[in-house]
């Protein structure tokens, strides 16, 4: 990201890092260029590319055997100078006594001019030079200067690198490069501008509810915006609709490249790539190869591009050949997802022992469902301050999923909670609350309440949670609410008959409130230091909600004595 660029020598320092990381890459400091020092012995023609920095791993990622011979980087978003390009071209031509050099040039005015001047200088030295221009950006299809060169550059460089290693001549490589560029189109969309290296602020303002559709890789604003931030599947469909109107999709299929613009997570890219594959195959388009990653970026712009290349005979084989370069592109795509069946296992203990009668168990689940729905926003806010912000979704989503399971499978409510949290809710909340509900299931599913059995269940849950999770009272976790609740319910005989569960709920609420004064020593909140002080632990609040729901069901006449959620989380 451009938050961590040095004050000066940005590009040189990055080139030094690349050369140190990959020993097969050499660095010339003045003029600045990078050279692959271990070319394939059959290669007769050198491949040279370059352009402004900030798009990495473009160009440098394919420097090496099976890719480029030399890369010429300019300053961030600035074309390299002709002297740089000429020096790199000469060095690549002389390494292995090549028959000529092919320039791969993105269609930007500065790149076109400087590569043309360098080509003239190199030809004057007696070295043949040809040029392939990559102009794939569909958003600039009607621009006077022609389409911009963007994502298809990676495809052109990969296919030409494979053919060059087989000893192809200059004319053959230039012809293939032109054909691949003509068969390729790209389109990009962004949700947030890149960070400007000059002032470390967004390069432009984009309303968070909109997407810039057709954004350029230098931050050139798009002609269109998509309002109301449409869902990603609709965005992908629109992009493919437009691309397929310009890309040949014959019997050899297509190469599809999904590239981050620098600030898009790998999780998002995997989702987008799955949607691309699903959409294309549903249209009858064969996807020979599907690549998803950071290939052509715009510093840290939050967005992605899709590139489609319609394949001709022989191209698929070139794509599938391996490379010895910093960037490794995947070969043939799977035609379908390989779906594996889970191993068979015995029925869960909760489900096997839970009675099928609805009774208190279903009433407890329904009450907890209502309580959790009201608490969702507050639990999320608490976890955003003390953790990663997912607790509200995990806990409340788990309760909702348990309701659906109970409806569908006809099992008792607390057993459904146990199954759902243990097997389907992620993070630490899933297994921890799964242990609680598993312990409660045999007793909470009976009506009226068996207080001694519930007391024993809470004690079992507490013992199991502390043994596996490692937390103890005072660590600012759910244990700080569960332990006092278990203690309150374990009083024999009950201090106040008919009020045992309400007393346990009060104890859990008081315990949850006290966590606001504790320093977290377990869980993600322990990493946030002072940020977690003054706020109750969300897990402890959820325990208080569980005990409150249990008390509401079995001691409804006392429900008014328990505080509502806003008061519950205030110390």
Regions found by a protein language model. Give the residues of each.
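N-terminal loops that bind phosphate or other acidic moieties
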Residues: 1-571
């Amino acid at each position: 990201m451009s938050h961590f660029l040095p004050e000066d020598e940005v590009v040189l320092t990055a080139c030094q890092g690349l050369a140190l990381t990959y020993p097969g890459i050499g660095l010339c400091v003045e003029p600045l260029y990078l050279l692959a020092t271990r070319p394939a012995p059959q290669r007769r023609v050198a491949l040279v590319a370059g352009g402004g920095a900030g798009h990495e791993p473009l160009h440098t990622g394919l420097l090496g055997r099976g890719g480029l011979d030399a890369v010429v980087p300019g300053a961030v978003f600035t074309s390299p100078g002709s002297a740089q390009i000429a020096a790199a071209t000469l060095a690549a031509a002389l390494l292995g006594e090549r028959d000529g050099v092919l320039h791969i040039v993105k269609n930007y005015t500065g790149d076109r001019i400087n590569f043309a001047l360098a080509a003239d200088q190199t030809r004057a030295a007696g070295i043949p030079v040809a040029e392939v221009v990559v102009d794939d950006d569909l958003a600039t299809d009607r621009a006077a200067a022609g389409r911009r060169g963007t994502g298809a550059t990676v495809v052109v460089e990969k296919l030409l690198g494979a053919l060059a290693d087989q000893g192809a001549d200059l004319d053959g490589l230039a012809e293939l490069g032109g054909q691949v560029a003509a068969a390729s189109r790209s389109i990009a969309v962004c949700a947030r501008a890149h960070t400007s290296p000059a002032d470390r602020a967004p390069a432009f303002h984009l309303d968070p509810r909109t997407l810039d559709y057709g954004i350029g890789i230098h931050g050139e604003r798009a002609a269109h915006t998509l309002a109301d931030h449409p869902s990603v599947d609709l965005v992908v469909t629109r992009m493919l609709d437009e691309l397929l109107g310009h890309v040949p999709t014959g019997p050899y299929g297509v190469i599809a490249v999904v590239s981050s613009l620098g600030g898009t997570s790998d999780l998002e890219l995997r989702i987008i790539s799955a949607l691309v594959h699903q959409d294309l195959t549903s249209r009858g388009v064969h996807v020979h190869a599907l690549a998803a990653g950071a290939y052509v970026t715009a510093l840290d712009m939050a967005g992605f591009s899709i590139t489609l290349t319609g394949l001709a005979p022989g191209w698929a084989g070139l794509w599938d050949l391996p490379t010895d370069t910093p960037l490794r592109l995947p070969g043939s795509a799977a035609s379908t997802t390989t779906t594996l069946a889970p191993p068979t296992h015995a029925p869960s203990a909760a489900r096997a022992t839970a009675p099928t009668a609805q009774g208190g168990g279903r009433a407890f689940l329904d009450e907890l469902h209502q309580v959790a729905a009201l608490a969702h926003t507050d639990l999320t806010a608490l976890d955003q301050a003390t953790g990663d912000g997912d607790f509200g979704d995990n806990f409340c989503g788990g309760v909702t999923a348990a309701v659906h399971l109970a409806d569908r499978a006809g099992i008792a409510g607390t057993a459904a909670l146990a199954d759902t949290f243990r097997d389907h809710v992620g993070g630490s909340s899933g297994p921890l609350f799964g242990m609680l509900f598993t312990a409660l299931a045999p007793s909470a599913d009976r009506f009226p309440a068996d207080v001694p059995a519930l007391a024993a269940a809470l004690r079992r849950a507490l013992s199991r949670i502390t043994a596996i999770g490692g937390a103890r009272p005072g660590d600012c976790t759910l244990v700080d609410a569960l332990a006092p609740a278990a203690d309150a319910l374990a009083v024999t005989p009950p201090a106040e008959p008919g009020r045992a569960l309400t007393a346990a709920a009060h104890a859990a609420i008081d315990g949850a409130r006290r966590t606001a004064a504790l320093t977290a020593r377990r869980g993600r909140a322990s990493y946030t230091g002072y940020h977690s002080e003054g706020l109750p632990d969300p897990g402890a609040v959820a325990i208080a909600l569980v005990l409150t729901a249990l008390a509401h069901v079995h001691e409804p006449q006392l429900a008014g004595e328990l505080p509502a959620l806003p008061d519950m989380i205030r110390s």
